Amino acid sequence: QVERAALDSIRAIMIIRAYRIRGHLAADLDPLGMTDRGNHPELDPVSYGFTEADMDRPIFIDNVLGLTHASMRQIIDIVRRTYCGTFALQYMHISDPAQAAWLKERIEGYGKEIAFTREGRKAILNKLVEAEGYEKFLHVKYMGTKRFGLDGGEALIPAMEAIIKRGG
């Protein structure tokens, strides 16, 4: 009994870590729903030895997701909403443990999902479209001139605006 509980705890922590590292592979990134997100084997509880009969048994996870005990069903629900939704965060590449812990504390657990209002989403989209349009304008106006574009950094535009608004 003790050995099974210890093994369940270790396997539960392993699957939580797998979602932290690989959850983006199952993220909902297709707003039109035209592609299948698929199932990644590293994110499947069966790969860690859990069966359907194990899904509702309480497992000690030592406050890892803000809970002392949780069933595998609860754990999967939390990590899927945190790391596989339409807005997800990756932080496992951050080498400073304090910075990674700061992010983890704010996103993991019940009620900590990041959700934008409809107006907020529109505002972010508007800023992205403005930035992309401005970059295209510069490309046409100053063709051949060396410049630095937004390629891959477009998401920084609404983030910088939010930082300026909050700090100013």
Tell me what each language-model feature is:
Residues 1-156, 164:
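Extended, charge-enriched "interface" segments that sit outside catalytic cores
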Residues 160-168:
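Glycine-rich phosphate/diphosphate-binding loops that line cofactor/substrate pockets in enzymes
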